[in-house]
Amino acid sequence: MKILIRLHDILKGFEAFEFLPLFLIRLYLFYVLWFAGINKIESFNKFSGYLGTLGVPFPDIFTWLVIITEAGGAALILIGLFVRWSSIPLLVVMFFAGYLVHWQNGWPHEANGIEFAAIYSLMLLTLLCFGGGKYLSLDYWVSSNK
């Protein structure tokens, strides 16, 4: 029993690093979302046309909304500013991307399925619930200066 208590105490020491997983999620999502938004700028007409074929009204406007949401949200998530607020429109984009684009292809990402949209949604939901984390997030420093 003493061994289990000692192991528990050792594992409890990892609480000092509780900020790290949230920071790593933010870094990863920045990379994915930033380049998704930037690539849509480079292929604006192609993406807008694709949205039009899906029946999305005003595809040019929605293309800009997606670009701003992905690139702007990625930048805010990277620096840890308004992380919870940024997660909400990004979750909406992920929902519609998953439903309109990926759902009919099933789960596997190899078939352009919903797998990555679901994983990114879970990561964004984590940020929505827990925020950007301690120390490496501007939200933390802004809220601690009250």
Task: For each feature predicted by the language model, list its residue ranges.
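Extended, low-polarity transmembrane helix blocks
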Residues: 1-42, 60-68, 72, 78-146
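Membrane-interface interhelical connector segments
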Residues: 42-58
